[in-house]
């Protein structure tokens, strides 16, 4: 078996995530949590290096990240459409009370959920988008529930 860029990418992410997981459960958790923006940027870089269909959809990547950031800026500052919430220090620098890398997070998650629906052989892009959206909502529910538990909210 020959080693290719996908194998190397998986190994890099695996090592980075394991070190991060161990780090955030250690006495140095604040330091490791402060690396979250780097984690997102590394994940994005690996995603972009491994993406192969650049001719058709390259412009969707920056548009998705920007749209995600704009939606979050609106949400954080108005409470619409997600309700009242705020970002702490973990995601790094902010613009208009919103972590700059949140758009990158949206891009990564949308790319991942779209990739997971491709093997389903669903021809309708609307149904695939709906399934991807449901996956995102489920993930958000899991993240929000765990954050409420960590922060002591019900």
What residue ranges belong to the model's regions?
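Aromatic-rich, lipid-facing transmembrane alpha helices and their immediate juxtamembrane interface loops
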Residues: 1-154
């Amino acid at each position: 078996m020959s080693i290719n860029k996908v194998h190397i990418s998986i190994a890099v992410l695996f090592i980075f995530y394991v070190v991060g997981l161990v780090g955030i459960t250690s006495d140095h958790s604040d330091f490791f949590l402060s690396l979250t923006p780097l984690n997102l940027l590394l994940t994005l870089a690996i995603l972009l290096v491994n993406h192969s269909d650049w001719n058709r959809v390259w412009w969707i990547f920056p548009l998705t990240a920007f749209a995600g950031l704009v939606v979050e800026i609106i949400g954080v500052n108005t409470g619409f459409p997600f309700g009242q919430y705020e970002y702490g220090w973990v995601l790094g620098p902010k613009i208009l009370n919103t972590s700059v890398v949140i758009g990158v997070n949206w891009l990564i998650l949308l790319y991942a959920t779209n990739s997971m629906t491709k093997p389903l052989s669903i021809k309708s892009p609307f149904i695939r988008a709906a399934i991807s959206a449901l996956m995102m909502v489920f993930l958000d529910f899991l993240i929000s529930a765990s954050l409420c538990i960590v922060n002591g909210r019900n």
